[in-house]
């Protein structure tokens, strides 16, 4: 895992969700949030706008596409937000925080920002319980974990800042993620998708 894109919950329309946040199967209409992601991708790193909403190539390049909530009732966005999925997704994020390699977390929307901030705070607190070489290794691993937060790419919020969160559009998440990875000696992520 080189980057984690954390969204809110799966698409709630029939045949849209495919297990990767923001992704839809080939041949499906590209949802508005994903259209905004593609708009930012083109503006940020100059990638051609993809013809498909399938983000599988990103997953193959080390991008974990995860939602804070993993299920949803049909036609009812965020309907399963209180079912406890955050315990599992928090565990996954915490494991990524402990990984030895650099990881950039792209937190899109307040629920994603809150979950990642909590996981990072717990990881920092856990350092105090370690000693010697184990603490040094964990501290070094945590030092190369980065959070890029913005509003959600939904048309309802993509172009507006919300408190301390910058607007998604114009936040340059793709180039900034690559800059952070490069600063840690890692290869940048190829964010391109088939046009």
Specify the residue positions occupied by each region the protein language model found.
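A short glycine-rich, hydrophobically flanked beta-strand micro-motif that places a catalytic Asp/Glu
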Residues: 49-52, 104-107
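Adenosine ribonucleotide-centric catalytic and binding domains
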Residues: 1-50
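Active-site cradle of extracellular carbohydrate-active enzymes
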Residues: 54-58
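Short coil/turn segments at beta-strand junctions that form active-site/ligand-binding loops
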Residues: 1-2, 61, 101-103, 145
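Short, well-ordered beta-to-alpha junction loops that form the rim of enzyme active sites
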Residues: 8, 68, 107-111
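C-terminal capping/extension of enzyme domains
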Residues: 30-33, 40-46, 70-101, 111-195
